[in-house]
A protein has these predicted regions:
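A structural motif corresponding to the C-terminal lobe/cap of the Radical SAM core domain
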Residues: 1-151
């Protein structure tokens, strides 16, 4: 949780030999983060990212696109946000794995994406409607211009 990280903690991390931190910020769009039940916002992640950079700690960010409520606009906002952090590496995942008995599995059943009887032993990934065709090409385009971005 970002609010638990401050400059004093980062100083201790550096003293302990920390060289890299993975930031699972998932989205740069606050409504999408709220929909994923994340307890932080993009500005908190930006604050921590800057502190880490100030102390020479490399940062890898994880961007998760296509969840419930995701739109073209929120995807664009997240990509721009991720780019603005100037991270050493960004890992983009499109679609969210559906696990049994979760809020996402209930949404996927309601939307007809999976059946209520699906045991989900074979991985299934939720992708918001309307993004199926557009999202992979958009991510590919962004990654083509950013060699430190992977999927």
């Amino acid at each position: 949780y970002p609010w638990k990280v401050d400059e004093d903690l980062v100083k201790l991390m550096v003293r302990a030999g920390c060289k890299e931190v993975a930031l699972g910020f998932e989205s740069g769009c606050e409504p999408v983060l709220q929909g994923l039940n994340k307890q932080f916002n993009p500005e908190e992640v930006r604050r921590i990212s800057q502190i880490l950079a100030d102390y020479g700690i490399q940062r890898m960010g994880f961007l998760l696109l296509g969840g419930p409520g995701e739109t073209r606009e929120s995807v664009e906002q997240s990509l721009i946000y991720a780019d603005s952090l100037n991270l050493e590496m960004v890992k983009i995942t499109t679609g969210i794995r559906i696990y049994p008995h979760t809020a996402l599995s209930r949404i996927a059943v309601e939307e007809g994406f999976i059946s209520a009887e699906d045991d989900l032993l074979r991985p299934r990934f939720y992708l918001a409607k309307g993004l199926e065709e557009w999202l992979p090409e958009t991510v590919k385009s962004w990654m083509a211009e950013r060699p430190n971005w992977v999927s």
